């Protein structure tokens, strides 16, 4: 940017079309957040009506994560081939239909399947919306684009909590899911009223269709074995998270099978850059493991251990969700100022100071608890708003939606494991101690993975000839692309 351009307020760098694109995607992501968290709010009511164990009830949260990897792959490939807009609209329709089905579910199995559908739609919405907005905004504002967009999910969670307190005590838990059908109307409006992402249009103008991840995996020479592996992964995840399999050794074996399948898919689709993709999946896995025990089981903790009524639960969840939403926006500013990775590490380190007090204070002072949760979620959860920007920077435009969608949503299986892990630990400890311990310890793993830029570093160790030295979204250098101790002069930009 020139000096004169730097003196202009950041929001003046955006034209009306870019703001409209952002607003539409943000509302879509708000509705995604609204639909997705409904099950966490009514988990105790559903558990009571269906007669479920704690682990079975937690598996209803996990179910949406089981299908996310395939939704991210399929809808991401749609975004790479046909445009980000169509993928975003299709995703909204998919998770809305799943939410409506939850309201009609007669029992555990039906609701579990409906949650699988929600997971696919949610995965597609994440990848398509994030790439859509990031590719529509100027390069120097793309951390803000990412952070502002992801704040919509937290706002949706806040809205859902407030609606829960008004609807469920009067009409019951099923009525909450019937409201979730409204996003379909919004999706139909989106299809006609928003432009396509600029980066995608420029990349595809006058060119033949790209070879997407779906083409590589399911239309290539290994398509039969890949289809079989897809069914094997789906079956393995079902047995792991449906709540019926109690043998830890079998669960571990099935988990290892899934890991091998996902790594195989990454190697086939990414070629020589597979180490980067595998490490990104690991980053996201631990990001979910540290954050989702709190996200998923906080309502249960408030209702059971602190004995809060629905109105008080809604108020506390407002502080939590609003803090995460504010944190996404703050993270966007920090990312554009400090750089994506440095902002991420600094925010997580600050959040560690607050995680123990949140669960040590008890339920005697609701307002102090709410304030602590606000700042802890602002720093610990909100910074994940720039995670799409961080991941997307490792992929070229013509593979970004599927690359981001698949990588993120395979790692998001940590979100499926997290509430079950929290519930299992809570059988030996109280739930608050279990949640605090998981979050505090696993956050440090994420700090190391991102702070040391392990995706670039492992790529340099294993396949240096395919190393990307600069971020594909904002052109900033990757710190892990050069050995520790090397100066800035060691960076030589590689061709995509």
UniProtKB/Swiss-Prot annotation:
A single Gene Ontology CC term: plasma membrane
Molecular-function GO terms, alphabetical: carboxylic acid transmembrane transporter activity; sialic acid:proton symporter activity
Gene3D superfamilies registered for this protein in UniProt: MFS general substrate transporter like domains
Main localization (coarse): membrane
InterPro entries referenced in this protein's UniProt entry, alphabetically: MFS (IPR011701), MFS_dom (IPR020846), MFS_trans_sf (IPR036259), SA_transporter (IPR004742)
Statement: the UniProt record of this protein carries the keyword Glycoprotein: no
Entry keyword annotation includes Repressor: no
Family: Belongs to the major facilitator superfamily. Sialate:H(+) symporter (SHS) (TC 2.A.1.12) family.
Function: Catalyzes the proton-dependent transport of sialic acid.
Protein name, entry field: Sialic acid transporter NanT
Organism annotation: Salmonella agona (strain SL483)
């Amino acid at each position: 940017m020139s000096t004169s351009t730097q003196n202009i307020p950041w929001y003046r760098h955006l034209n009306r079309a870019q703001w409209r694109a952002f607003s539409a995607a943000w509302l879509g992501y708000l509705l995604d957040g609204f639909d997705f968290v409904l099950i966490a709010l009514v988990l105790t009511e559903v558990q009571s009506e269906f007669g479920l164990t704690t682990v079975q009830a937690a598996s209803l949260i996990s179910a949406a994560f089981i299908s996310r990897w395939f939704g991210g792959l399929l809808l991401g490939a749609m975004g790479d081939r046909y445009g980000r807009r169509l993928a975003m609209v299709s995703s909204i329709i998919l998770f809305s239909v799943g939410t409506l089905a939850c309201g009609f579910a007669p029992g555990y199995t039906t609701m579990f399947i409906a949650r699988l559908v929600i997971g696919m739609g949610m995965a597609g919405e994440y990848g398509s919306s994030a790439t859509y907005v990031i590719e529509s905004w100027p390069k120097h504002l793309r951390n803000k684009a990412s952070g502002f967009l992801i704040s919509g999910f937290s706002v949706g969670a806040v809205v859902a909590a407030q609606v829960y307190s008004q609807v469920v005590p009067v009409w019951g838990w099923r009525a909450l899911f019937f409201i979730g059908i409204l996003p379909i109307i919004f999706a139909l409006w989106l299809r006609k009223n928003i432009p396509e992402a600029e980066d995608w249009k420029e990349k595809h103008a006058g060119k033949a269709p790209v070879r997407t991840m779906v083409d590589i995996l399911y239309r290539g020479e290994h398509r039969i074995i890949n289809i079989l592996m897809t069914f094997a992964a789906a079956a393995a995840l079902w047995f792991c998270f449906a709540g019926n399999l109690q043998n830890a050794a079998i669960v571990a074996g099935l988990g290892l099978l899934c890991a091998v399948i996902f790594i195989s898919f990454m190697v086939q689709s990414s070629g020589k850059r597979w180490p980067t993709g595998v490490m990104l999946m690991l980053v996201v896995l631990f990001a979910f493991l540290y954050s989702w025990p709190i996200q998923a089981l906080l309502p249960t903790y408030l209702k059971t251990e602190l004995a809060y009524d629905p109105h008080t639960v809604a108020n506390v969840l407002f502080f939590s969700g609003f803090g995460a939403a504010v944190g996404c926006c703050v993270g966007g500013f920090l990312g554009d100022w400090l750089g994506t990775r440095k902002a991420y590490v600094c925010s997580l380190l600050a959040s560690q100071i607050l995680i123990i007090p949140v669960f040590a204070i008890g339920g005697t002072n609701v307002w102090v608890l709410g304030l602590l949760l606000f700042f802890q979620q602002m720093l610990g959860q909100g910074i994940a708003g720039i995670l799409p920007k961080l991941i997307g920077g490792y992929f070229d435009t013509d593979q970004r939606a599927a690359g981001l969608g698949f990588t993120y949503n395979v790692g998001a299986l940590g979100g499926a494991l997290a509430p079950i892990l929290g519930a299992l630990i809570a059988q030996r400890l109280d739930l608050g101690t279990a949640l605090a311990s998981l979050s505090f310890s696993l956050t440090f793993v994420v700090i190391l993975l991102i702070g040391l830029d392990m995706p670039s570093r492992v790529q340099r160790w294993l396949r240096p000839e395919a190393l990307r030295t600069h971020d594909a979204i904002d052109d900033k250098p990757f710190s892990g692309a050069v050995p520790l101790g090397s100066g800035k002069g060691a960076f030589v930009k590689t061709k995509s």
